[in-house]
Amino acid sequence: MEFIYQFVWIVPFFPFIASILIGVNLLFFPKSTKSLREIWAIFSILLLSIAMIFSFNILWQQINDNIIYRYLWSWIFDNKIDFKIGFLIDPLTSIMLVLITTVGVLVMIYSDSYMSYDQGYVRFFAYLSLFTASMLGLVLSPNLIQIYIFWELVGMCSYLLIGFWFTRPSAANACQKAFVTNRIGDFGLLLGILGFYWITGSFEFEILFKRFNDLVINHEVNLYFANFCALLLFLGPIAKSAQFPLHIWLPDAMEGPTPISALIHAATMVAAGIFLVARWFPLFQLLPFVMTIISWVGAITAFLGATIALAQTDLKKGLAYSTMSQLGYMMLALGIGSYQAGLFHLITHAYSKALLFLGSGSVIHSVESIVGYSPNKCQNMAFMGGLRKYMPITGITFLLGTFSLCGIPPFACFWSKDEIITDSWLYSSTLGSISLVTAGLTAFYMFRIYFLTFEGDLRVNLNKVAFTYPVSIWGELNLNKKNSNKNKFVLNKYDIFFETDQNENQTDNLSFFSDIKKLKYPKESDNKMLFPLLVLTLPTLFIGFLGAPFPEGQIGSDLLSQWLYPVFKSAEEITSGNWLEFGLNAINSLSVVFSGIFIAFILYGPFSLFPQNLEKNIEFSLEKNLNSFFSFIYNWSYFRGYIDVYYNIVFVKGTRLLAQSLSFFDEWIIDGFVNGFGILTFFEGESIKYLEGGRISFYLFGLIFGMIILLFIGFFGAMF
């Protein structure tokens, strides 16, 4: 057992070696490396697969032994400081290792086909391996400094992968936005780390938690300062896990390749923030004020993400806001003390969301052959519809992922989400109401995405490249009405417009894709892309039973609580009780969920007649109110809750205005004064030089005249 633990460094080391070898060969031998790109891809998949096998072995040892293992060695030490590096293995670490490696391997297999036509194929696998290695190093870290190092590596990799197609202006802007937004959180994280080192004198988790616990119990620490430092620590997860108000980078991250979207939203970047809050849970639980802030940030994020996702037209951005909402659920659970439910939802959501994103990638990959390679076309659900007939495996797996994310039993997310909703009600009726309403919204927008994408008729061939035609919110093309709306902030009733890319021609006519013929109808993806989808359906169906409330245990009614007990044994968790109580509480949430599905079916379903008969079935005043209501919802969703608009006006334009004002002040006031003084001196010298004639008598006259003037001034000055 100990032998296995001593070699756990292999888990992050293997994908790290893969990224280094690919990067070095790509730098010094680019032609030969690109010619052997399939071999390098297999090499990356093989090394990460070995890491996955080790991860499963470690998880099995943790299930059997249920102990915490640390391996440390001194890196920097003197009389005053002894900084150690190493790794920490506990149930939380083992679960995260399996989660990261399994999703990572499936994403790599998927990427082999998805990125096959891309010139950056080899570079993509180098970034992918480094991204996975960074996240694995993060979850194995035993101290704050080591976590911060890998935390920054994760951020760097996300920057590289979001901006992978850096020649596309939108991708370049998106990676910069993600980088700058996360810098805010990382700065707070660094200050929080330094603050707790000042309080406890240690970076090691075990020592830090014990010392801080003793300081709080003995009232030997300033709680105001401790709360402030804890909030600074929490600022890091707020940014990394896209929590309000630093969530704005997440939808823009969809500019990266779809496999990376699956990895970011399932097992790496956004999961890092949740993992950190879980790792620091023994610290945060001693500070009730911070726990309250965490819970409310999570609740606001969950509800906000769900409302913004309601009318998204971009397939990937709709799923991105879904991720934001589900991360809010996890943060809410951790904030109310239900750590098991939060981590449980992290696991179930990861596999379900990976399935959904890879399914969306399969759709995009197929639709690209019809509409071209512009994201505003191939990701726009207004061009889709009826894809289940052409892509049955993708459609079925996407539907299973939708069932899970909506919380329909017996799929995975049902068990975790319902537990969070129930625990929220036990903690606060307000938080419980928010989580319950969010569940209904989730069911609505997820089935809206499914119906617009896979049901009905294929709409792209009806459009005839008339991108100015709107499509109603119900998902039907309207070829009789032109877009006459010119207001930047108000969209016309409930219309979804085809947005064209200003670089559309360059995107669609890339010479690299010139040999690919456009098809009239989409077709199912190849086996390399379908295999990960089929594999991910298994955890989507069955992993929820890991935390199902079966026989009562000592500290919880499920296996997951028992595995996590050594990590959180000091926590007083809110629990929803036994199987019967859980089932009774699930009735309310399921009723809300099925209501959301029913509304989505009426508005977007394949047999929907409500929109066509709207004017016949309801009174004019009600129709007008409904139009205003739907218009508000769509405007709110389209403009992302106006938060991006606010940030753009206050921070972006405000900063530019300040910079322009400072530039004007520097150029015309500071430089003007200095340059003006120099010019004045120059003209003064030029004027005086003509008084010099070379005659001594003239100089004596000037000297005597000057003395007389000075005496005159001195005499009259003394009198007055």
Swiss-Prot record:
Q: According to its UniProt entry, what is the function of this protein?
A: NDH shuttles electrons from NAD(P)H:plastoquinone, via FMN and iron-sulfur (Fe-S) centers, to quinones in the photosynthetic chain and possibly in a chloroplast respiratory chain. The immediate electron acceptor for the enzyme in this species is believed to be plastoquinone. Couples the redox reaction to proton translocation, and thus conserves the redox energy in a proton gradient.
Q: Which reaction does it catalyse?
A: a plastoquinone + NADH + (n+1) H(+)(in) = a plastoquinol + NAD(+) + n H(+)(out); a plastoquinone + NADPH + (n+1) H(+)(in) = a plastoquinol + NADP(+) + n H(+)(out)
An example GO biological process term is: ATP synthesis coupled electron transport
List the Pfam families hit by this protein, alphabetically.
Proton_antipo_C (PF01010), Proton_antipo_M (PF00361), Proton_antipo_N (PF00662)
Its domain of life reads: Eukaryota
Question: Mind listing the UniProt keywords for this protein, alphabetically?
Answer: Chloroplast, Membrane, NAD, NADP, Plastid, Plastoquinone, Quinone, Thylakoid, Translocase, Transmembrane, Transmembrane helix, Transport
Q: Which gene encodes it?
A: ndhF
Q: Which residues form the signal peptide?
A: none
Q: How does it assemble?
A: NDH is composed of at least 16 different subunits, 5 of which are encoded in the nucleus.
Name the protein family: Belongs to the complex I subunit 5 family.
Tell me yes or no: is Transmembrane among this UniProt entry's keywords. Answer: yes
Question: What InterPro entries is this protein classified in?
Answer: NADH_UbQ_OxRdtase_chlpt_su5_C, NADHpl_OxRdtase_5_subgr, ND/Mrp_TM, NU5C-like, Proton_antipo_N
What PANTHER family is this protein classified in?
A: NADH-UBIQUINONE OXIDOREDUCTASE CHAIN 5
Respond yes or no to whether keyword Acetylation is given for this record: no
Which named protein is this?
NAD(P)H-quinone oxidoreductase subunit 5, chloroplastic
